[in-house]
Curated annotation (Swiss-Prot):
Keywords: Cytoplasm, Lyase, Metal-binding, Rhamnose metabolism, Zinc
Name of the gene: rhaD
Pathway: Carbohydrate degradation; L-rhamnose degradation; glycerone phosphate from L-rhamnose: step 3/3
Co-factor binding details: Binds 1 zinc ion per subunit.
Annotated source species: Escherichia coli O81 (strain ED1a)
Record field: catalytic activity: L-rhamnulose 1-phosphate = (S)-lactaldehyde + dihydroxyacetone phosphate
Domain of life: Bacteria
Protein name: Rhamnulose-1-phosphate aldolase
Localization (cell): Cytoplasm
One Gene Ontology term, aspect cellular component: cytosol
Stored InterPro entries: Aldolase_class_II_sugar_metab, Aldolase_II/adducin_N, Aldolase_II/adducin_N_sf, Rhamnulose-1-P_Aldolase
Enzyme class of the recorded protein, top EC level: lyase
Length: 274
């Protein structure tokens, strides 16, 4: 019998959650992570599955996700503990044939359940599948320190925030030319914040929750982690710059245009226009 904890997807989740905790982005039970899988990924590990998988209904149907398996972090679980006990802190779930609920196939032992932000994750997966023709498979939410700090001092506007991050580090425009979506402050763990996040995910691979954290989407765990890491590095630079009396020079609009042309990306027009 193959051991599912040695699979690429469990090992990938262990690395991503451990790295995020070491970055200081996921204190206590902060943060959540989901990876969309294929049946072929989990097929070799059926002998590891629960004999009687628990069924949990969704608060709203997700027909586009019908029959789709995911590996997810658990509600109330600490990222720092995933590496110590993957089966207690992670779970593989599979949405049923009509998208009305899901079964917990593996993990989430002792009656644990998936992250409370599962509505936001599933709704965002739904939108990113459409936006990227199925390329994006990962949704990551974390409490990236400097990005959160900037939501207290910058205007919480997509164009403004995006432009500042682009100017904070040259690679940012190349990594997220589609900019950063921003929500108003909302109560977490609700369908409402999930729907608002998913709406922004139609246009952006990064979405900020002011005074709370960030959502990122990408095709792989590495790409998604790297996306957030890049934005957070720029935010860290900006926090230092603002504490040293602000910018005296920066990347100009013309230089941003040249950067986009060099790397074949189309920068968010509203941010470029500022």
């Amino acid at each position: 019998m193959q051991n599912i904890t040695q699979s690429w997807f469990v090992q990938g989740m262990i690395k991503a959650t451990t790295d995020a905790w070491l970055k200081g982005w996921d204190e206590r039970n902060g943060g959540n992570l989901t990876l969309r899988l294929d049946d072929a990924d989990i097929a070799p590990y059926h002998d590891n599955f629960h004999q009687q998988p628990r069924y949990i209904p969704l608060s709203q149907p997700m027909p586009l996700l019908a029959n789709t398996p995911f590996i997810v972090t658990g509600s109330g679980k600490f990222f720092r503990n995933v590496q110590l006990d993957p089966a207690a802190n992670l779970g593989i779930v599979k949405v049923d044939s009509d998208g009305a609920g899901y079964h917990i196939l593996w993990g989430l032992t002792n009656e644990a359940v998936p992250t409370s932000e599962l509505p936001a994750h599933f709704l965002s997966h739904f939108e990113r599948i459409k936006a990227t023709n199925g390329k994006d498979r990962v949704i990551m939410h974390c409490h990236a320190t400097n990005l959160i700090a900037l939501t207290y001092v910058l205007e919480n506007d997509t164009a403004v925030f995006t432009r500042q991050l682009w100017e904070g580090s040259t690679e940012c425009l190349v990594v997220f030319p589609d900019g950063v979506g921003i929500l108003p402050w909302m109560v977490p763990g609700t369908d409402e914040i999930g729907q608002a996040t998913a709406q922004e995910m139609q246009k952006h691979s990064l979405v900020l929750w002011p005074f709370h954290g960030v959502f990122g989407s990408g095709p792989t765990l590495d790409e998604t982690f790297g996306l957030i890491d890049t934005a957070e590095k720029s935010a860290q630079i900006l926090v230092k710059v603002y504490s040293m009396s602000g910018m005296k020079q920066t990347i100009s609009r013309e230089e941003l245009i040249a950067l986009g042309q060099r790397f074949g990306v189309t920068p968010l027009a509203s941010a470029l226009a500022l």
